[in-house]
């Protein structure tokens, strides 16, 4: 079974959206390498006694240099496994997105953005573009990030139907683009889940803080 290691409400929906869009089955060996990469990262995080919630990556700020070096080794090992996954499924966007996500786990945001852009070249999905925007913003490329967010919102706006994951990603893209009032109207009209609605409305007050809660 494929797994995508993402935390936080919008990112969980990003993962769900990507899985829904899968239109071809990857090689079984790719699936196995991917699962090994995720298991390796999860095992490290569990040993590090960091809970897998929206505060997980923010805890990286207080880690010692030793812990950061260990984290780099873990990220590098995960990337090697995902390189093997891509060897057997080179046209499958999912593994490019996985590499981006696991680079982000180690706060390597330029690499994360680069690999998410590669995923976009394989399949043009708003979920992937949202991820690219977030990683670009964390890398300090705010203008490029906002261009991605506006494009994401336009893509969702033109869809005839939106899944629950689509609606949350749509609202989050508007939040990150700074369109506070439009984001609030979209949340009011599209988000029915009480918890998701509450979290997203809170995020409209400070988009950068919301992003920093997901990534250090």
Range-by-range predicted roles:
Residues 18-76, 80:
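N-terminal leader/linker segments that initiate helical-solenoid repeat arrays
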Residues 31, 94, 127-128, 165:
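Start-of-helix register in tetratricopeptide repeats
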Residues 172-216:
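Terminal, low-structured helical/coil segments at or just beyond the last alpha-helical repeat
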Residues 90, 123-124, 157, 161, ...:
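Short coil turns that delineate tetratricopeptide repeat
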Residues 98, 131, 169, 203-206:
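Canonical tetratricopeptide repeat
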